[in-house]
């Protein structure tokens, strides 16, 4: 079996990630990466945060490399509709233009639904 390439989309902003790291010893995306690697150790995992324009640009330019995309949970609220939340929604909308399989968890599902 060939390697699987997965893109994990972090659902927390840096401040919320710090709280998560204190509680769980890793970010939401890192914890999810560890689970994926336990299930399939040969998986290549890339983690991005949609608030980082350079990361999203690179991910979208290389979308054909990924077998799947996972949108993690997070602590943000769609009703707040901050600039960062809008970037998450825009990134998800752009992901739907490609044929990748998508798994969206909690916050990630809200973002994908809004996209």
Regions found by a protein language model. Give the residues of each.
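N-terminal beta1-alpha1 cap of cysteine-dependent amidohydrolase-like domains
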Residues: 1-90, 94-98
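Catalytic nucleophile loop
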Residues: 96-115
């Amino acid at each position: 079996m060939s390697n699987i390439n997965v893109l994990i989309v972090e659902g927390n902003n840096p401040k919320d990630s710090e709280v998560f790291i204190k509680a769980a010893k890793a970010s939401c995306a890192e914890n999810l990466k560890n689970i994926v690697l336990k299930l399939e150790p040969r998986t290549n995992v890339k983690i991005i945060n949609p608030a980082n324009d350079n990361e999203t640009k690179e991910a979208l330019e290389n979308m054909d490399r990924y077998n799947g995309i996972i949108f993690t949970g997070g602590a943000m609220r769609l009703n707040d509709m901050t600039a960062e939340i809008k970037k998450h929604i825009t990134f998800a909308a752009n992901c739907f233009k490609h044929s990748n399989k998508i798994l969206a968890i909690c916050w990630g599902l809200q973002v994908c639904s809004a996209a």
